[in-house]
Amino acid sequence: MVKKIGVLTSGGDAPGMNAAVRGVVRTALTQGLEVFGIHDGYLGLVEDRIEKLERHSVSDMINRGGTFLGSARFPEFKEVAVREKAIANLKKHDIDALIVIGGDGSYMGAKKLTEMGYPCIGLPGTIDNDIAGTDYTIGYLTALNTVIDAIDRLRDTSSSHQRISIVEVMGRHCGDLTLMAAIAGGCEYVITPETGLNKEALIQNIQDGIAKGKKHAIIAITELMTDVNALAKEIEAETGRETRATVLGHIQRGGQPGAFDRILASRMGNYGVKLLVEGHGGRCVGIQNEQLVHHDIIDAIENMRRPEKLELYKVAEELF
């Protein structure tokens, strides 16, 4: 029977992580459990930076961006000896189970602990929206609005100067953030890991647009696909139209979470605790068709695939 639980945030921060921690803490206390916060993710777990949390510990946190528990990249957690030390620290505090809030790397850590017999629940916290088994991740829609706001501002200046603007969006190997921002921001071109980058076709499309009287254009592209500044120089050289690249970077992770992410994070935090109370471990939480669901975390990482957004790419193509 679970009496004490731990909670940590790991990997890249995402708006709504604090709301998720709050959901975990408040629900755990309501259920008569003790709850412990672990600072700086798996690194803090190994270094035993663990403190007991009370209701007041999460007061005024629901509207705050980032994560008050802190986060850190910690690749050494892949090592068995390191994970054994983490479990020893959890047992030292008599913590029976752990809730991990983060992205795919964080899930992998939870999976490894699960395989070692320690019960974990994963909550999807990442702006990339790249986690299988859920329609939305915590922080994604807030980041989407941040990107759209930036695109709107770029359009103002691009149209004033008859300029082509390239905007680089986060997402790593997932194009969801770029695709949705491109549709909502009215971008002329969208380039994601799912579409690939065809420079010749892109330049030809831009030239065709100029020939038809197009005065400016915005290209949305997912990070890590190419050097966007070099791409801007190529486009300018081929089209004769001034072209500039803007890398949005970490601004996409910051800011107050929107209403959707606050509610989603609160629901997921609440649900994660209840799963542990009911005796479930080794699960990850998602939302599908507006309903909270849970999956085997090992199966989610190894076998589940995110559905392709073919219809939305078709919409984007027809609107551009």
From Swiss-Prot:
Function noted in UniProt: Catalyzes the phosphorylation of D-fructose 6-phosphate to fructose 1,6-bisphosphate by ATP, the first committing step of glycolysis.
PANTHER family: ATP-DEPENDENT 6-PHOSPHOFRUCTOKINASE (PTHR13697:SF4), PHOSPHOFRUCTOKINASE (PTHR13697)
Amino acids binding ADP: 22-26, 155, 186-188, 212, 214-216
Pfam families: PFK (PF00365)
Family to which this protein belongs: Belongs to the phosphofructokinase type A (PFKA) family. ATP-dependent PFK group I subfamily. Prokaryotic clade 'B1' sub-subfamily.
GO biological-process terms attached to the record: canonical glycolysis; fructose 1,6-bisphosphate metabolic process; fructose 6-phosphate metabolic process
PROSITE patterns: PHOSPHOFRUCTOKINASE
Record-listed ATP binding positions: 12, 73-74, 103-106
Keyword Translocase set for record: no
Major site of localization recorded for this protein: cytoplasm
Complexes and interactors: Homotetramer.
Pathway: Carbohydrate degradation; glycolysis; D-glyceraldehyde 3-phosphate and glycerone phosphate from D-glucose: step 3/4
Organism: Aliivibrio salmonicida (strain LFI1238) (Vibrio salmonicida (strain LFI1238))
Residues annotated to bind substrate: 126-128, 163, 170-172, 223, 244, 250-253
Locations listed in the record: Cytoplasm
One of the record's GO molecular function terms: ATP binding
Protein's UniProt name: ATP-dependent 6-phosphofructokinase
Stated regulation of activity: Allosterically activated by ADP and other diphosphonucleosides, and allosterically inhibited by phosphoenolpyruvate.
Keywords: Allosteric enzyme, ATP-binding, Cytoplasm, Glycolysis, Kinase, Magnesium, Metal-binding, Nucleotide-binding, Transferase
Swiss-Prot/TrEMBL catalytic activity: beta-D-fructose 6-phosphate + ATP = beta-D-fructose 1,6-bisphosphate + ADP + H(+)
SUPFAM superfamilies (alphabetical): Phosphofructokinase
E.C. code: 2.7.1.11
Names of the cofactor(s): Mg(2+)
Location of the active site: 128 (proton acceptor)
Bilayer-spanning residue ranges: none
